[in-house]
């Protein structure tokens, strides 16, 4: 698919440019958000504790994951998309992060993996069959998705849900981030 502007080709759309590229950009934006959160927290105190810890462990509502887990899941979704769409198994990353620096390192590790996935290994994989993890069948009722279905109905929506929720947690706490962040 090509996008046109006054007869000029702007870019070619494919599974890589519509899935992996925007995920990588959003992960890079999350690095900036974490830096802004740390800078903001340095100006606040909650008793004797640094406000950074409060931010990282806050959540929007009681039954939702905290900021740290939102970042971990966003990274998991991004690396899984890059892996599954290129017919690989996603690399394992244990969820051990407790600090802003550790979260940033996880994002960097995710980006490093995604950069190893060649666009050519994903382009044209709209019709591949992706076997979903066991929890998917229990929650959603299916075992497999096409590459296109996986990207558009699972990977992208889940990734953006968790990235946006992380952003919303920071906004809720007064961190000066805006739409352009």
Model-derived features: positions:
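Short, Lys/Arg-enriched N-terminal segments with co-localized hydrophobic residues
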Residues: 1-10
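Acidic interhelical loop/turn segments
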Residues: 42-56, 116-151
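Amphipathic alpha-helices that form helix-helix packing interfaces
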Residues: 23-26, 30-33, 37, 74, ...
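C-terminal or internal capping secondary-structure element at the end of a domain, subdomain, or sheet
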Residues: 148-181
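Alpha-helical scaffold segments that form or flank carboxylate-/histidine-based iron centers
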Residues: 12-25, 48-76, 94-104, 140, ...
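Long, well-ordered alpha-helical segments
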Residues: 30-45, 163-170
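Short, helix-capping/interhelical loops that line the mouth of catalytic, cofactor-
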Residues: 71-113, 132-135
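Short alpha-helical "patches" and their helix-cap loops
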Residues: 42-51, 87-98, 170-181
């Amino acid at each position: 698919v090509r996008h046109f502007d006054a007869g000029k080709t702007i870019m070619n759309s494919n599974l890589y440019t519509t899935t992996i590229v925007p995920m990588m950009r959003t992960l890079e934006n999350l690095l900036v958000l974490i830096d802004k959160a740390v800078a903001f927290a340095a100006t606040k105190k909650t008793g004797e504790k640094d406000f950074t810890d409060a931010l990282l462990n806050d959540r929007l509502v009681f039954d939702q994951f905290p900021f740290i887990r939102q970042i971990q899941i966003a990274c998991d979704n991004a690396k899984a998309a890059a892996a599954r769409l290129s017919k690989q198994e996603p690399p394992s990353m244990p969820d051990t992060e407790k600090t802003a620096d550790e979260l940033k390192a996880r994002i960097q590790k995710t980006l490093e993996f995604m950069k190893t996935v060649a666009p050519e290994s994903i382009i044209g994989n709209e019709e591949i069959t992706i076997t979903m993890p066991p929890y998917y069948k229990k929650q959603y009722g299916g075992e497999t998705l096409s590459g296109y279905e996986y990207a558009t109905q699972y990977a992208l929506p889940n990734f953006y849900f968790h990235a946006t929720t992380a952003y919303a947690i920071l906004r809720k706490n007064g961190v000066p981030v805006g739409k352009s962040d």
